[in-house]
């Protein structure tokens, strides 16, 4: 009982303290200037609402008198608006007013901490402090020296009692284009006025953190489900973070986290805010999308690109198509796609290589087609080196409801991606602290970034408003992608990147050859995922799991390996090369120049395909071999790999023989009954034949010693097989 009696006064004191704190917070008002609702302003409001700040915005709907908005040089308009707003608060002695910019400011903590730090400053007015003097460097000598901290006044944020702030701005009679910072600086540098109003600077960034001149000092601090900006130089946790001018990009980075928009405990807490759901909307009511396709250089797997475009789960009748093809190499592929599928789209516009339109001009044309059409709701720009493997990609991007958004795309096995997390001082790539985590999926969310490329979705309304008078793809001497991002940033439009889903990947174009008939066959090293999709049978993984492997003869295994495209292109490549052997024993292509069991064939090394074929054997045949012949390990070495051609009037069959291999792979490249009649393989020791080889299926059997075999006669048409003597 005595303990309870002792605790009662303590509880009463805590209750009184809480009431006093609440009363104190009620006497705090945040004033800011925002002439229009930009994305930066909405971010500011969201962080303020998170901490329950009371905000009053000044100047909404008013024209800004200086180009560049409220954060630009000038700023006298802000003083005028503040002076007028303070008229009704001038006699409120208990009212504390925080005045901050809004487009480039976020709150990192709440009113209680703000007011506590303000009271500890023991001043009537506290200004933010900066590393550099601005705008008049001649005034530097007049500034009081400080033993530790930032020396110079910053006008982007200050806090004070209402009567003192009224005195501060009472003398303002300048123009809207005059400098607010110079006005406040001259008052501060006047010792009499500084003492009369009782003005101090937040030298150690306890309240205000100006990022300009302090980028190396500020890091993110993750703590108990919250995120703060920490100043390493002074070991302080600022309440207000301000990133004006060139430091806006760093503020965008910090704003991805502060105050609790992404944490390690919660992940992204705001990714589902403001979504535009497309569920339940009929096809005819879906937004109209203009898809801009850009083929700017020789690109592998263009057929797959168009196939993935067709697979998008979005009605073609709500899509318009604009294609810029700069490459004659792809002219027939583009025309074939449009001939087969162009009528499925609402409209089609093609600019081919004969027009010779520059990359940037073509991209501007695509954006203009949407900008100038009020019915165009979205512009979806996609480069041909994008492998868009998620069929719901377009819907997912639309639902995220951002002005500009890109899906994360990376190159296979590399950190190369379609976004930059930061920019260097000269505007080029710089790796942000979170770049690798975002690329590798350890941090998942929707990220405000300074650079995107290759694929992005833009709202038509943004093209007709914030971006309406912008030559989007020209900027100084920059490439079109960097020009686009620089222009968008300049218009204060945020560019977002989402890695909430696996959308696809980027192709590597570095080593793409155009000297063959079917150049994609050579891409097994550079673009292995796409090579597999195009050339490896869809049921190969089932075969690897043992579900689709047949045994037509003892120790002879039969399983799917190649797609129709792989078979057809390999045959066409060989016929295009055309230098078939004569089918006699003399053969200068092999060591010794003598072939004991000759065929009419072309070796893989004759078409410079030996290295790629070995990669195929290692990646797809070796795993099957090791599964089917337990205890055997192979690196799939070979001396001979070739395509054989059988014709009734040329070489219809092959005599009984042993192969010079530990095991042999024999892949049927065309279809019995359609392309030829007869054919097959007979294993004499077992009196067992495979008479109807399936196109794209491989026969795998031991070579020397046990499996003595012959090629059965082809009686009509032409039969092709791909043969490899592995581990000779």
From Swiss-Prot:
Name of the protein in question: Procollagen-lysine,2-oxoglutarate 5-dioxygenase 1
The Fe2OG dioxygenase domain is annotated at: 637-728
Keyword set for this entry?
Dioxygenase, Endoplasmic reticulum, Glycoprotein, Iron, Membrane, Metal-binding, Oxidoreductase, Signal, Vitamin C
Q: What does this protein do?
A: Part of a complex composed of PLOD1, P3H3 and P3H4 that catalyzes hydroxylation of lysine residues in collagen alpha chains and is required for normal assembly and cross-linkling of collagen fibrils. Forms hydroxylysine residues in -Xaa-Lys-Gly- sequences in collagens. These hydroxylysines serve as sites of attachment for carbohydrate units and are essential for the stability of the intermolecular collagen cross-links.
Catalytic EC class: oxidoreductase
One of the record's GO molecular function terms = L-ascorbic acid binding
| Keyword Metal-binding tagged | yes
- Native organism is Mus musculus
Q: Name the cofactor(s).
A: Fe(2+); L-ascorbate
Subunit text: Homodimer. Identified in a complex with P3H3 and P3H4.
Transmembrane region(s): none
Q: What is its EC number?
A: 1.14.11.4
**Where do the catalytic residues lie?**
719
* Subcellular localization, as worded in the UniProt entry: Rough endoplasmic reticulum membrane
One BP term from GO: peptidyl-lysine hydroxylation
**Entry-linked Pfam families:** 2OG-FeII_Oxy, GT_PLOD, OGFOD2-like
Residues with attached carbohydrate? 198, 539, 687
Signal sequence annotation: 1-18
